[in-house]
Swiss-Prot record:
Protein name, UniProt field: Putative phosphoribosylaminoimidazole-succinocarboxamide synthase 2
Catalytic activity: 5-amino-1-(5-phospho-D-ribosyl)imidazole-4-carboxylate + L-aspartate + ATP = (2S)-2-[5-amino-1-(5-phospho-beta-D-ribosyl)imidazole-4-carboxamido]succinate + ADP + phosphate + 2 H(+)
Gene name for this UniProt entry: purC2
Top-rank taxon, per record: Bacteria
Pathway: Purine metabolism; IMP biosynthesis via de novo pathway; 5-amino-1-(5-phospho-D-ribosyl)imidazole-4-carboxamide from 5-amino-1-(5-phospho-D-ribosyl)imidazole-4-carboxylate: step 1/2
Organism: Caulobacter vibrioides (strain ATCC 19089 / CIP 103742 / CB 15)
């Protein structure tokens, strides 16, 4: 499926709503009654910058998260109040906990905090876990492990933490950590089981939690989306692993690689990304959505700009 690039949602413009905060991908508006309006844009970010807008990306993220929030509501309460638009989630405003719960089922990753990066440097003890010698890249771990990280301020990098460090720094209480750990591992187990039914491997993911007005722990942000998770195609995993090849995935890194080959992306201006590359990224997101959820992606009406539709649907929801 090819979507029209001019209809991509790059800038969210809702001046009538209060308390605006723009993240890398999502724009948030805090309403006086405790609800938060979360609009997923089509922005594709890397190198701490926005590279381009990928048509359909925000809708894929919102609707994939919706699929998983619905599928895991029996495990853990979540922040969802309503979905007035394919790109919009209305959530409960929470007091966010300052730790991200990353769960990993495989020795994988490319970031400085990933267990594969640390393992290849010779480290065997990380995040309070000891890994055996002799593991290979992308190998399944004996069991899923929690690898928490601190939530870095803008411009800083997340720092790896052991459970003991989480508690020593007072990021959460011991009782909260016990509940967070149980929730994260149960959510991951459900995700892996459902992904397997779809011919996929959920290799790793991250969860964010907050506290509601009663102090209860609530799942926030997103869950098992193509941005927060690593999904591989199960049918080719074993053969590719034995051959020392990377697992087949819904890889979007080709946009990042194209930019990195042409400039210093941290300091130079970003060159205009070709339309065919953006269309390819859009197709990957849509393929991922359909593979993960088993649903058919409902392409937006090209005759109405996405921002106009978002505003129309939000106006109707908030007036109701």
């Amino acid at each position: 499926m090819t979507l029209s690039a001019p209809n991509a949602l790059a800038v969210v413009d809702l001046p009538c709503l209060p308390n605006h905060y723009r993240g890398k991908v999502r724009d948030n508006y805090d309403l006086p009654d405790g609800r938060r309006v979360i609009v997923a844009s089509d922005r594709l970010s890397a190198f701490d910058r926005n590279l381009c807008a990928v048509p359909g990306k925000g809708q894929v993220l919102t609707e994939t998260a919706r699929f998983w929030f619905d599928a895991t509501a029996d495990i853990c309460p979540n922040h969802v109040v309503a979905y007035p638009d394919p790109n919009v989630l209305i959530g409960k405003r929470l007091k966010m906990l300052p730790v991200e719960l990353v769960v990993r089922g495989y020795l994988a990753g490319t970031t400085s905090t990933s267990i594969l990066t640390l393992y290849n440097k010779g480290e065997r003890q990380m995040y309070g876990v000891t890994l055996p010698d002799g593991l290979k890249a992308n190998q399944r771990l004996p069991q899923a492990i929690l690898t928490p990280t601190s939530k870095a301020a803008d411009g800083d990098h997340d720092a790896p933490l052991s459970p003991d460090e989480v508690l020593a720094q007072g990021l959460v209480t011991p009782a909260q950590w016990e509940q967070l750990s149980a929730y994260a591992l149960a959510l991951f187990a459900r995700g892996q089981a459902m992904a397997a039914e779809r011919g996929l491997i959920l290799a790793d993911t991250k969860y964010e939690f907050g506290l509601d007005e009663t102090g209860a722990i609530v799942l926030a942000d997103e869950i098992h989306t193509p941005d927060s998770s690593r999904f591989w195609k199960a049918a080719t995993y074993e053969a590719r692993f034995e051959a020392g090849q990377r697992p087949e995935s819904f890889d979007k890194d080709f946009v990042r690689a194209w930019v990195a080959e042409r400039c210093d992306p941290y300091n130079d201006s970003i060159p205009e990304i070709p339309a065919e590359l953006i269309a390819q990224a859009s197709a990957v997101y849509i393929e991922a959505f359909e593979a993960i959820t088993g649903q058919t992606f409902a392409a937006p009406d090209a005759s109405e700009p996405v921002m106009a539709r978002v505003k129309r649907n939000l106006d109707a929801y908030l007036a109701g």
